Amino acid sequence: SYGPRADDCRLTVLDVGEGQTLLLQSGGQSALIDCGGYSDTVCADRAWQMLRSQNLYDLDLLLFTHFDRDHFGGTENFLTQIPAERVILPGISELLPLGQVVTEDCAVPFGKGILHIYPYSGGNKEQENSMAILFETEDCGILITGDLDVAGERRLVKNHALGADILVVGHHGSKYATCPELLDAVQPELAVISVGENNYGHPTQEVLDRL
């Protein structure tokens, strides 16, 4: 977990192997961003355990960057135990009649800050069409890009102010993400890579050198 002040902004990156399950908390509200990993049941179990350790039995918000299994596969298991008041989905798929589908940039009040949600649909694969999420409070900024590719990152840099304290490194450290232009724009103090045993070479040395 990381956060300058626990009540203002806290991000917990759960250990789910080659996947991503993130818990964002601010001002007494909790949001799960993605719910996937090397095992659908393990990522759901670890998300439950984290919430229940804080006596939390529901979520204010559930968001997905995209629908690849390593970001989404634990969702059904998770929702059997803990409900979400609001669900936000990227407008790249109609897989779930579950919540609000976002097709344009929008801002959502959350805790003591604002969630800026930036959908993208210019990639060649669904994972490259990831929705980027920037959470900002007065004292903290967190940028999450899912598996967004370099073209999507450059679009973000061109269209938005992206300065953030924490960067969740895109696509588990793949060389096809985390371009120099993005790093120059964000200037993170801390970069976190959610990764586990894999056959893709993640995180690549190229990305580690850029960081």
Role assignments for model-derived ranges:
Residues 1-211:
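Non-globular, low-confidence helical/coil segments that flank catalytic cores
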